């Protein structure tokens, strides 16, 4: 087969604050010929996750993205050429494909999916959504980090995002007595209760007193706070946690674009209410992804 090319987004410069059109650059690159055990994949979708933001500016648990390097992310694609006996042309696969239109990759670095699983409302993007990193983050955050028990009340920030929305639905399926989501618009809040199965929602932009709104919506307090935001919202949520409450720290949306992180300031309740807070990286549970996806 003749020479093939890919279009790829790379990091042009490190952003100060919110990334803009100067942060990224679109390049075209030739793809190499296949070697044994490799496949050529046409990428159909790639993810854009808030958790990718820190690596654009600084060192993280996955390292800092070097200037001029591909933006890394999960992706979905179709095998168009193969020298791997386990993968055929036309197979749907996922992997760490990054922001590019195609790539040559070792077959063992791809996960093959059955297209029959994705029908009706379950679109192929579920493979990198509810069954991908966002879904796994929700699952292990609730089950392994927060230790959700039957009948408990769960409060979730950024609840209309991929992680938050999945966490809310999973919490109900895992036996939570009440699940409350925090979002930033009436439309998002309406969706949480009408479509996503949340018991109540809070529009933090409209709340006259966010702490009172949290306390009222949770029915007097929460056992678990699933934190995707950090900042002032975290400090406020700490005040409404019940004795022995747990905080699972999944993300820090309020902190990612700050040059100097605000950090947590409300620490006394950790003593008086015997609270615990634990951060986690979902990749620590990667060997358990398969069984978790089957249960989901």
Which residues does each predicted region cover?
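NAD(P)H dinucleotide-binding glycine-rich loop of Rossmann-like/cofactor-binding domains
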Residues: 73-78, 89-158
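Mid-domain Rossmann-like dinucleotide-binding core that forms the NAD(H)/NADP(H) cofactor-binding site
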Residues: 128-207
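Short amphipathic alpha-helix with an adjacent loop that forms part of the alpha/beta core around
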Residues: 208-219
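Glycine-rich phosphate-binding loop and adjacent beta-alpha segment
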Residues: 193, 232-296
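Glycine-rich beta-strand-centered segment in the early N-terminal region that forms part
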Residues: 31-48, 56-99
């Amino acid at each position: 087969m003749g020479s093939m090319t890919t279009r790829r987004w790379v990091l042009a410069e490190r952003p100060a604050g919110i990334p803009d059109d100067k942060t990224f650059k679109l390049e075209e690159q030739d793809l190499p010929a296949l070697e044994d055990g490799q496949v050529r994949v046409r990428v159909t979708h790639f993810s854009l996750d808030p958790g990718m933001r820190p690596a654009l500016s600084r060192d993280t648990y996955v390292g800092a993205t070097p200037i001029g390097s591909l933006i890394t992310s999960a992706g979905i694609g179709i095998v168009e050429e193969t020298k791997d006996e386990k993968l055929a042309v036309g197979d749907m696969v996922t992997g760490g494909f990054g922001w590019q239109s195609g790539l040559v990759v070792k077959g063992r670095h791809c996960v093959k999916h059955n297209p029959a699983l994705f029908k009706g409302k379950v679109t192929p993007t579920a493979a990198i959504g509810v069954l991908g990193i966002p879904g796994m983050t929700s699952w292990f955050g609730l089950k392994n980090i927060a230790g959700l028990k039957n009948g408990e009340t769960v409060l979730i920030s950024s609840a209309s995002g991929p992680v938050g929305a999945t966490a809310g639905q999973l919490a109900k399926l895992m036996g939570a007595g009440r699940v409350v989501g925090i979002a930033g618009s009436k439309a998002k809040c309406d969706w949480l209760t009408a479509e996503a199965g949340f018991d109540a929602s809070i529009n933090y932009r409209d709340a006259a007193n966010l702490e009172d709104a949290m306390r009222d919506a949770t029915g007097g307090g929460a056992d678990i706070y699933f934190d995707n935001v950090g900042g002032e919202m975290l400090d406020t949520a700490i005040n409404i946690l019940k004795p022995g409450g747990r905080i699972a720290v999944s993300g820090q949306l309020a902190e990612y674009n700050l040059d100097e992180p605000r950090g947590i300031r409300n620490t006394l309740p950790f003593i008086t209410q015997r609270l615990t807070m634990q951060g986690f990286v979902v990749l620590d549970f990667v060997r358990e992804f398969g069984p978790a996806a089957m249960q989901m």
